[in-house]
């Protein structure tokens, strides 16, 4: 732990918390700070100009990152008949109906995302207290309740990330791994920012994207100059 603290302190000394770094410089710093023995995730925190306490200003959605997330995702799908076959063909690891619900109730949840066809919500709806706290409850706002389950599975496998603003008005998301090339991280960040812009509430006033900061799992936050991101 002491070594980690010393390493973190050394990286913190390299980063000016008050400075806005050009996107390329920010990514270089973040990748340099990602020196752990595992392939650290590269995360972004975006401070939004919204009032998260107001229901009409809750920002939520999903986006497929063009360079993927660097993570292998296991998908469970509630579907039957032809849609079940389509889900399996698209690569879903687990497909079912009441049998899948029973597995979940028994605590057997070896998957990272749950997708549901609308006609299965009578079953899925009974699992809210189990799936909800784990962030697994299907929701049409993030594309996980859809009649096109095959596309939803493909998107999940291709690197789709879900986002939802927290109580402080901040969006937290992972845009890749430390092993990614800077260009891949840049394209993923741009895709996320574009999705956030599209999800801007009509009632949001003033500056919408207030602050953007990047960090690695074990690193420190580096603030990004948004003008340089827009110039990419």
Swiss-Prot record:
Cross-referenced InterPro entries: Ribosom_uL1_bac-type (IPR005878), Ribosomal_uL1 (IPR002143), Ribosomal_uL1-like (IPR023674), Ribosomal_uL1/biogenesis (IPR028364), Ribosomal_uL1_3-a/b-sand (IPR016095), Ribosomal_uL1_CS (IPR023673)
GO terms classed as biological process: regulation of translation; translation
GO molecular function, one term: tRNA binding
Gene3D superfamilies membership: 3.30.190.20, 3.40.50.790
Domain of life of the source: Bacteria
Pfam families assigned to the protein according to its UniProt record, in alphabetical order: Ribosomal_L1 (PF00687)
UniProt key word Isomerase: no
Classification via CDD domains: Ribosomal_L1
UniProt KW keywords: Repressor, Ribonucleoprotein, Ribosomal protein, RNA-binding, rRNA-binding, Translation regulation, tRNA-binding
Assigned GO CC terms: cytosolic large ribosomal subunit
Subunit structure: Part of the 50S ribosomal subunit.
Database matches in HAMAP family: Ribosomal_uL1_B
Family, per entry: Belongs to the universal ribosomal protein uL1 family.
Function: Binds directly to 23S rRNA. The L1 stalk is quite mobile in the ribosome, and is involved in E site tRNA release. Protein L1 is also a translational repressor protein, it controls the translation of the L11 operon by binding to its mRNA.
Protein name: Large ribosomal subunit protein uL1
Source species: Burkholderia multivorans (strain ATCC 17616 / 249)
């Amino acid at each position: 732990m002491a070594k980690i603290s010393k390493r973190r302190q050394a990286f913190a000394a390299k980063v000016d918390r008050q400075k806005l770094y050009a996107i390329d410089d920010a990514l270089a710093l973040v990748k340099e700070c990602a020196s752990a023995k595992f392939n650290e995730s590269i995360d972004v925190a975006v401070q939004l100009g919204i009032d998260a306490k107001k229901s009409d200003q809750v920002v939520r959605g999903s986006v497929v990152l063009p360079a993927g997330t660097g993570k292998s995702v296991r998908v469970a799908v509630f579907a039957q008949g032809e849609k079940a076959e389509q889900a399996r063909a698209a690569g879903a690891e687990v497909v079912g109906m009441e049998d899948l619900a029973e597995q979940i109730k028994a605590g057997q949840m070896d998957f990272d995302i749950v997708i549901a066809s609308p006609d299965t919500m009578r079953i899925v709806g009974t699992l809210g207290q189990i799936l909800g706290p784990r962030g697994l409850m299907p929701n049409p706002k993030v594309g996980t309740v859809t009649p096109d389950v095959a596309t939803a599975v493909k998107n999940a496998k291709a690197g789709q990330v879900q986002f939802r603003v927290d109580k402080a008005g901040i969006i937290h998301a992972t845009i890749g791994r430390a092993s990614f090339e800077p260009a891949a991280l840049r394209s993923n960040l741009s895709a996320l920012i574009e999705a956030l812009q599209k999800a801007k509430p009509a009632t949001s006033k003033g500056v919408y994207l207030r602050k953007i900061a990047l960090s690695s799992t074990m690193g420190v936050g580096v603030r990004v100059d948004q003008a340089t991101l827009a110039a990419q």
